[in-house]
Amino acid sequence: MNGIRDVVREEQPRERLLLEGAGSLSNRELLAVLLRTGSKEETVLTLSDNILHHFDGLRMLKDATLEEMMSIHGVGIAKASQLMAAFELGRRMVRLEYQNRYSIRSPEDCASYMMEEMRFLQQEHFVCLYLNTKNQVIHRQTIFIGSLNTSIVHPREVFKEAFRRAAASIICLHNHPSGDPAPSREDIEVTKRLVECGRIIGIEVLDHIIIGDHKFVSLKEKGHI
């Protein structure tokens, strides 16, 4: 009996999941369950190891593109699609859980809400959180991807969604891929422009949070709002 359990433990992650629960599996074993099979040359666990090694663990894997996944020997379009779909479902479930109950009372609350999703992004993402009168998140929208400047961040795109969602206020966020959240001159100019537009139309811009590598800066706390 022990011999059978040893085989299950080493070679059959799905069976181990059924016996011991998903929480008992390692990252490589969970990945193997999603992949289902290996290739003619290697087992599914070896393929899992290769994927994790290629992406330096889960940190980079969660944001890998279809092409990046398919560049690994043994990963075709079917396996790459399965992984991307699983990761996206995970992100949506986390987002839904927070969105259904998350109230923002401070810059720390806002940074905690978005930190893990934004801190590892390789390009700048400008995101808006739309809040109701209780400061609860009712919607979030990525406005654009790319370097932040006043010619790209148009108030129309920011406030259009606020009207659609009947939002009472907005919090803006963007990340610095360098990991340093110190605001640039462009960051400050964009913020002031959006704050002024919000004041005119009656939808307050509460803050602009810059996300770095596990740290953040609030432009409101810095006196720019």
UniProtKB/Swiss-Prot annotation:
Q: Where is this motif: JAMM motif?
A: 174-187
Q: Which UniProt keywords apply?
A: Hydrolase, Metal-binding, Metalloprotease, Protease, Zinc
Does the record bear Zinc-finger in its keywords?
A: no
- Gene3D superfamilies given for it? Cytidine Deaminase, domain 2
What Pfam family is a match for this entry?
RadC
Q: Give residues annotated as binding Zn(2+).
A: 174, 176, 187
Q: Which residues form a coiled coil?
A: none
Please give the superkingdom of this protein's source: Bacteria
One GO BP on record is: proteolysis
Q: Which GO terms describe its molecular function?
A: metal ion binding; metallopeptidase activity
Which PROSITE patterns does the record cross-reference, listed alphabetically?
Answer: MPN, UPF0758
* Ranges where the MPN domain occurs: 103-225
**Family the entry assigns:** Belongs to the UPF0758 family.
In its UniProt entry, what is this protein called?
Answer: UPF0758 protein BcerKBAB4_4299
